[in-house]
């Protein structure tokens, strides 16, 4: 009931390690080390707690299986109808995700027999596009504030309770910062749906501190996570609906900028069922092939059109599942004799390294090169940032032309 000051207050506390147990106080020896025998009994006596040694001995006699298998379950959901984005529709993948999430959420909100969709947020609903869901399903939206590590744990734990647990955040926060918590979600066979926005170089003026250029490599360290990097709004919509229903941990990763739907002859190429592990050919070509990660497929198609003007017909594959290598697409690409992988990810540890390593294991032969992020990116409009990194359409075309010279 005292007076409140309208300014920040810092409270400093001096604590005592091992407080309450005389032989432990101010000694680091017992950090991670249990007292045993007479010392344990003395500690329990000083703390006023019961001696549980006899009970523990009885528990040790019980028989437990050496291991138990935990099988994540597919959610019972009405996924609604996928939206179609046409040639005139330019939007960002974030908005396509948010729209699909809100629709599925509303279709199943408080419906008997349907899995509840629970969405977690860390003060970024406007940026990660979960605001529409919050309006339509207010009781299923949890605002956690700026507590990314806690939220990663909570979202993973919630998935064990029979709900579809979704957490959307920037890539650097949801994965890079909360890496160990996501690792534990993998260990525990959770069912979190992690949506990472602002990945790669596509963060605008926020610059290098917010450029998550290692998400593929971080996810590749896990054994059970599925990673999807949609190529355009159509694929984002379908991948979102697929992820919400799919058992286990699933990560969707996308950038910030608006981009057109990938089309051919005025028809959307990715307005089709999403299949995990499929690299979709979005442009035909016999002279060379580009394997492009996620939204880089759009720039790769533009590069292929520039190359076509010079008589080089280049196939383009939209690689949306970098951890699940499509060996059919990889083999097809290598049959052209010239393969360029393109990604706005650390070039050393991204999709290119994974896919070319697999090509070697399969005994595929071709001139191949990786194109990607080779230093921390700049701060500025995305198009300028990509150009400075050598990842604009014209720079991609130049890189492939140079590679073709090596192939001769």
Describe the residue ranges of each PLM region:
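Thiamine diphosphate
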Residues: 1-253, 258-259, 393, ...
């Amino acid at each position: 009931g005292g007076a409140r000051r309208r300014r920040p207050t810092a409270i400093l506390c001096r604590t005592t390690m091992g407080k309450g147990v005389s032989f432990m106080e101010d000694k680091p020896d017992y950090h991670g080390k249990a007292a045993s025998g007479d010392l344990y009994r003395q500690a329990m006596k000083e703390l006023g707690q019961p001696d549980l040694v006899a009970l523990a001995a009885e528990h040790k006699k019980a028989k437990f299986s050496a291991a138990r298998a935990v099988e994540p379950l597919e959610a019972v959901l009405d996924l609604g109808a996928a939206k179609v984005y046409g040639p005139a529709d330019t939007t960002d993948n974030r908005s396509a995700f948010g729209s699909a999430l809100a629709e599925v959420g509303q279709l199943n909100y408080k419906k008997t027999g349907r899995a509840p969709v629970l969405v977690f947020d860390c003060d970024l609903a406007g940026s990660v596009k979960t605001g529409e869901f919050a309006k339509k399903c207010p009781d299923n939206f949890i605002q956690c504030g700026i507590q990314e590590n806690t939220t990663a744990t909570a979202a993973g734990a919630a998935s064990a309770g029979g709900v579809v647990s979704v957490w959307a955040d920037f890539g650097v926060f949801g994965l890079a910062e909360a890496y160990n918590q996501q690792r534990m979600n993998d260990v525990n066979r959770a069912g979190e749906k992690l949506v990472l926005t602002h990945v790669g170089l596509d963060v605008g003026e926020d610059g290098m501190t917010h450029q998550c250029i290692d998400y593929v490599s971080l996810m590749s360290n896990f054994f059970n996570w599925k990673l999807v990097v949609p190529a355009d709004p159509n694929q984002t919509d379908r991948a979102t609906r697929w992820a919400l229903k799919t058992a286990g941990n699933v990560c969707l990763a996308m950038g910030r900028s608006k981009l057109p739907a990938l089309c051919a002859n005025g028809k959307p190429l990715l307005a089709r069922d999403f299949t995990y592990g499929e690299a979709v050919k979005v442009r035909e070509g016999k002279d060379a092939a580009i394997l492009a990660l996620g939204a880089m497929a759009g720039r790769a198609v533009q590069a292929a059109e520039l190359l076509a003007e010079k008589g080089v017909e280049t196939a383009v594959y939209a690689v949306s599942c970098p951890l699940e290598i499509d060996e059919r697409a990889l083999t097809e690409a290598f049959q052209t004799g010239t393969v360029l992988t393109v990604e706005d990810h650390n070039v050393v540890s991204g999709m290119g390294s994974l896919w070319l390593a697999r090509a070697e294991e399969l005994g595929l032969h071709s001139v191949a090169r990786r194109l990607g992020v080779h230093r921390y990116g700049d701060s500025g409009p995305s198009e300028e940032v990509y150009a400075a990194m050598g990842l604009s359409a014209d720079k991609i075309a130049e890189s492939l032309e140079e590679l073709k010279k090596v192939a001769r």
